From Swiss-Prot:
There are 2 substrate-binding sites: the catalytic A site, and the non-catalytic B site that may play a role in the transfer of substrate or product between the active site and the solvent. Alternatively, the B site may bind allosteric effectors. It catalyses: (S)-malate = fumarate + H2O. The gene is fumC. Homotetramer. Keywords: Cytoplasm, Lyase, Tricarboxylic acid cycle. Substrate binds at residues 95-97, 126-129, 136-138, 184, 316, 321-323. Pathway: Carbohydrate metabolism; tricarboxylic acid cycle; (S)-malate from fumarate: step 1/1. PROSITE patterns: FUMARATE_LYASES (PS00163). It comes from the Bacteria. This is Fumarate hydratase class II. It is found in: Cytoplasm. The active site is at residues 185, 315. The lineage of its organism: Bacteria, Pseudomonadati, Pseudomonadota, Gammaproteobacteria, Legionellales.
């Protein structure tokens, strides 16, 4: 153990760790739960700390010599080499102060080590005076939230969702001439093609991609430079813009300084907005995954209109059973994301005066929603969607036996007579054609001409 100090006094810290006194106090005071700060968020902190020191050098606030050590430490942090030094829990101060200081202390001590100094000495690099220069926890944490979410959505969610959309679009075209019975209210309905059914899934995902791309730019607004309450106290007038420009350059994402820092600190409306879009995506994916597992149900006593890949044994007691596991995993992800949105919505409503103090729980839930949806889309695509095949025999059986084909007769003999045909066929267990002929409403040739599934699906 080594001794480190802060404004409250001296405390022992594990000698092999780069974090310092404030991080150690957080470990003691907030031994709550198992949820630690996500590594993606820590990486984003590394990006903003690097941008801050680059800016402070340009503005003449930090010497290039000190900056070089800080920059090296930031680069190691960004690369994930220092992840073992970030043990703090989500359940801490609502501004994320302990995590901001955890980052400051780790960067400071690693920079000190690189400079040949003694860990905990705060020389030549001080965690507050140098690493945290021109910053506050109140503006760094929301900035890190935005960087994390924007990067994950850009580089993970959108690509994986696009691949799934493309696969379903390919299936829609592949199934374009396979006519099947439709279902509404879980009851038989008029026909459509399997391709048309899948085109609905494609449209849903297209709409979600549009919505995601629409809200993504709201994350580009950064709070950095607002410091404690949004006034920018203790910062150079050019710091906010220059730092945001550096973040944009480091990430390849067009981040910029928020025009109103008071809103950027006191509210997290952008996070609530993005989470709402992710919830909508979860609802869409839930519908798609549910449809696919129902359509694949069976193999002999279910709907069975499609066949999905057999990935693993499905039962420890029933030999040969194969379950729709990818759909089940996807739907569990969806309910988690919907729950996360509820948490984020409530947390987002709780800003008081100049600060919202629910930031860590909002960050944790949003990050989880993004990576769960990203991973689930990739998994569902690779292990289910690409291998979907039609069961033509089952499809034809249902189509030929459906009473709802009688709908095609509405314009010829009227709704009431068509309904009479359907009820007679159902009650007596005959075909629609047999019932129509027995009632004398149509001839055989008239029935065959009118009741043609191909004419009913607009292909």
């Amino acid at each position: 153990m080594r001794k480190e100090s802060d404004s409250m006094g001296t405390i022992e810290v594990p000698s092999e760790k780069y974090y310092g006194a404030q991080s150690q106090r957080s470990l003691i005071n907030f031994a709550i739960g198992r949820e630690t700060m996500p590594p993606e968020l820590i990486r984003a902190f590394g990006v903003l700390k690097k941008a801050a020191v680059l800016t402070n050098v340009e503005l003449g606030k930090v010497s290039q010599e000190k900056a070089n050590f800080i920059l090296k430490a930031c680069e190691e942090l960004i690369a994930g080499k220092l992840n073992d030094h970030f043990p703090l829990k989500i359940w801490q101060t609502g501004s994320g102060t302990q995590t901001n200081m955890n980052v400051n202390e780790v960067i400071s001590n690693r920079a000190i080590e690189l400079a040949g100094g003694k860990l905990g000495s705060k020389e030549p690099v001080h965690p507050n005076d140098h690493v945290n220069m021109s910053q506050s926890s109140n503006d760094t944490f929301p900035t890190a939230m935005h960087i994390t979410a924007a990067e994950m959505i850009t580089h993970q969610l959108i690509p994986n969702l696009t691949v799934l959309r493309d696969t379903l679009e390919k299936k829609s075209k592949e199934f374009s001439e396979i006519i099947k019975i439709g279902r509404t209210h879980l009851q038989d309905a008029v026909p459509l093609t399997l391709g048309q059914e899948f085109s609905g899934y494609v449209a849903q995902l297209n709409h979600n991609l549009e919505a995601i791309n629409d809200v993504l730019p709201t994350l580009y607004r950064l709070a950095l430079g607002g410091t404690a309450v949004g006034t920018g106290l203790n910062t150079h007038p050019q710091f906010a813009k220059k730092a945001a420009d550096h973040i944009a350059e480091l990430t390849g994402i067009p981040f910029y300084s928020a025009s109103n820092k008071f809103a950027a600190l006191a509210a997290n409306d952008e996070i609530v907005l993005v989470s709402g879009v992710l919830k909508t995506l979860a609802c869409s994916l839930m519908k798609i995954a549910n449809d696919i597992r129902w359509l694949a149900s069976g193999p002999r006593c279910g709907i069975g209109e499609i066949v999905i890949p057999e990935n693993e044994p499905g039962s420890s007691i029933m030999p040969g059973k194969v379950n729709p596991t990818q759909s089940e995993a996807m739907t569990m992800v969806c309910v988690q994301v919907i729950g996360n949105d509820t948490t984020i919505t409530i947390a987002g409503s709780q800003g008081n005066f100049e600060l919202n103090v629910y930031k860590p729980v909002m960050a944790y839930n949003l990050i989880q929603s993004i990576y769960l949806l990203s991973d689930a889309c990739r998994s569902f695509n690779d292990h289910c969607a690409v291998g979907i095949k039609p069961n033509q025999e089952k499809i034809n059986d249902y189509l030929n036996n459906s009473l709802m084909l009688v709908t095609a007769l509405n314009q010829i003999i009227g709704y009431d007579k068509a309904s009479e045909i359907a009820k007679k066929a159902y009650k007596e267990g005959t075909t629609l054609k047999e019932a129509a002929l027995q009632l004398g409403y149509l001839t055989a040739s008239e029935f065959d001409k009118a009741v043609d599934p191909k004419k009913m699906v607009a292909i």
